[in-house]
């Protein structure tokens, strides 16, 4: 059997070098070991999967990437697995045709669909057809509000969905009922959040009150964490870069950084229009004061969340990572807080501020009450117990056989694939015809 080169979309069975086939060493809590096989399609989902599996004791985890248009580059993969059990290990890339063989070779108790909806649907459809099938679990790689019925439909065959806050559990339980996708909604902290108890602003006293959370001095490094989808309008993105340029121009001893998720030409989970790379280049061409002092940063976010730094964003999960480390954090309020911007949860957090605050380097931190209710709940090992129960049910052949859901999933996948190969004018004409019936 041949051994795939790094990044080569081919899998040749279980006989592979240790760096490819062996699961990382297990952490033990005296529980019955379970086998989890994860399939990801993008950098953000790979990061979530490897961090999640690295936090679970008594788990034999194996991680694969599936070949697809948003497959991460070697640099993106290295950044995604940094600090996890998969750091410095090869992540095999498989094709869709390899899925059944991969699952058969490793006989997992649980298949983790850590990927975008259409890929999860393919993975779960393949796994569900096995005799004594594995349990099927999915989730999102960051903040999951608002809950999407479309996302639930792609995951129709799942047995459980992992949510990351009490509000998310409630929202996805409701979405499950409305979409008629029966599944358990499990609660877990986002795996990159590792603070003991509630995070506290670094260098602040335990008695500090919310007004004291705002930094008095400008940060040494002001990091902006962008998102592919929001804000959508170029004018709004230009306003963000303008505020960063004003900060850089007014604070010569500080640094402003746009922490990019990918380099030009690389793919992300979501397509980005009006990239900050292009906008910053335009600002520099027009000689906007301070634009030349804005840096573009690449690599793991953790490299940027250091003492003396502060983070600003519109709604990125990076805000939670920053808060977790006690770093001053600001959610930009100029564009509002709503479902479209994916940032409703931060309204009233105590960590919101304007672009004028960004330019001034006046960055705050969330209220303790908000932290306790949103994403920073206590960790009690319940997720591992829930997964252990699912694994036991899978081993005993007690998982449901959802024949009707299987049919719906196949039909959805056929429609999705036809949509990708059918010319847009034909699809548009077909939709107009349907509306006239």
Report residues per predicted region.
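Active-site-proximal region of nucleotide-activated glycan assembly enzymes
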Residues: 130-195
């Amino acid at each position: 059997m041949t051994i795939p080169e790094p990044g080569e979309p081919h899998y040749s069975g279980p006989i592979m070098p240790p760096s490819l086939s062996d699961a990382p060493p297990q952490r033990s809590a005296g529980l019955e070991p379970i086998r989890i096989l994860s399939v990801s399609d993008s950098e953000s989902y790979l990061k979530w999967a490897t961090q999640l599996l690295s936090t679970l004791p008594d788990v034999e985890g194996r991680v694969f990437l599936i070949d697809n248009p948003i497959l991460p580059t070697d640099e993106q993969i290295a950044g995604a697995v940094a600090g996890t059990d998969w750091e410095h290990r090869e992540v095999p890339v498989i094709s869709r045709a390899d899925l059944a063989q991969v699952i058969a070779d490793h006989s997992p108790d649980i298949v983790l669909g850590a990927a975008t909806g259409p890929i999860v649907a393919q993975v779960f459809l393949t796994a569900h057809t096995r005799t004594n099938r594995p349990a099927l679990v999915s989730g999102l790689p960051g903040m999951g509000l608002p809950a999407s019925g479309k996302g639930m439909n792609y995951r129709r065959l799942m047995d459980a969905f992992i949510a990351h806050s009490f509000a998310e559990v409630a929202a996805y339980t409701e979405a499950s009922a409305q979409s008629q996708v029966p599944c358990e909604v499990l609660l877990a902290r986002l795996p990159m959040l590792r603070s003991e108890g509630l995070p506290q602003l670094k260098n602040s006293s335990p008695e500090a009150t919310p007004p004291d959370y705002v930094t008095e001095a400008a940060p040494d490094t002001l990091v902006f964490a962008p998102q592919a989808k929001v804000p959508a309008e170029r004018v709004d993105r230009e306003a963000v870069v303008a505020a960063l340029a004003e900060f850089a121009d007014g604070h010569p001893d500080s640094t402003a950084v746009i922490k990019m998720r990918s380099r030009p030409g690389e793919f992300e989970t979501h397509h980005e229009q009006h990239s900050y790379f292009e906008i910053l280049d335009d600002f520099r061409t027009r000689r906007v004061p301070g634009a030349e002092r804005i840096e573009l940063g690449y690599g793991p976010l953790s490299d940027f969340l250091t003492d003396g730094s502060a983070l600003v964003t519109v709604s990125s999960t990076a805000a939670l990572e920053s808060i977790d480390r006690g770093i001053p954090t600001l959610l930009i309020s100029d564009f509002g807080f709503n479902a479209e911007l994916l940032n409703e949860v931060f309204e009233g957090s105590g960590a919101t501020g304007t672009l004028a605050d960004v330019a001034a380097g006046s960055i705050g931190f969330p209220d303790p009450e908000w932290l306790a209710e949103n994403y920073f709940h206590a960790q009690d090992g319940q997720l591992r117990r829930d997964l252990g129960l699912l694994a036991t049910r899978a081993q005993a052949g007690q998982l449901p056989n959802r024949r009707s859901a299987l049919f719906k999933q196949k039909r959805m996948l056929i429609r999705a694939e036809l949509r990708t190969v059918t010319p847009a004018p034909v699809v548009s004409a077909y939709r107009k015809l349907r509306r006239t019936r």
